[in-house]
Amino acid sequence: MGLPGAGKSSVALVLARAWDCGVVDTDDEVAQRAGVGVAELLRSHGESALRKLELDVVSDLKHRDVVVATGGGVVATLGARELLKELPTVWLDCDDEVLVARLGDEERPLLGDDWPASIKRLRVERTPWYEEVARARVDASGTVDEVAVRVAAAIDVVDT
């Protein structure tokens, strides 16, 4: 888990390949269940509809042997936080400047037009939740492979 641009989806793919298991991106799963992309779901039904579907997805994935890349805001729902606490959840964290640079031209409806200000606001809002849920906090700056190695090491330490 982590803020937009932290590398959640990319790192999850690398870890799933390394561990020879499946990978599920909750944003993709939410879009599949909703029948529309996350951006359209937000525009047409609001954030509460997104959070409800995220909670359902996390609940359904709890007992599957897969690497899960969560949406950055999954922690906004108490039920999802409670579920994530039961899993080896890792917080991918890096400087705001890195996050903004990584986002490029992607469509991010929750960020609005001023991405640096939105990232700063989301960090203030979500950091307490990330701290509550995460078993480990990993530096997400660097390449995807470097971050994946850090995550694997953090999970190994947490699980022993």
Predicted regions span which residues?
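A glycine- and Lys/Arg-enriched "phosphate-lid" helix/loop adjacent to the NTP-binding pocket
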Residues: 86-128, 152
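Hydrophobic/aromatic beta-strand patches that form the interior of the parallel beta-sheet core
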Residues: 24, 88-90, 136-138
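Conserved glycine(s) of the Walker
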Residues: 7
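Short glycine-rich anion-binding loops that position phosphate/pyrophosphate groups of nucleotides
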Residues: 72-75, 95-97, 143
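ATP-dependent small-molecule kinase phosphotransfer cores
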Residues: 22-83, 109
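NTP-dependent small-molecule kinase module
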Residues: 10, 14, 18, 101, ...
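Short, flexible helix/strand-to-coil boundary loops that buttress conserved ligand/catalytic motifs
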Residues: 34, 42, 54, 62, ...
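P-loop (Walker A) phosphate-binding loop of NTP-binding proteins
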Residues: 3
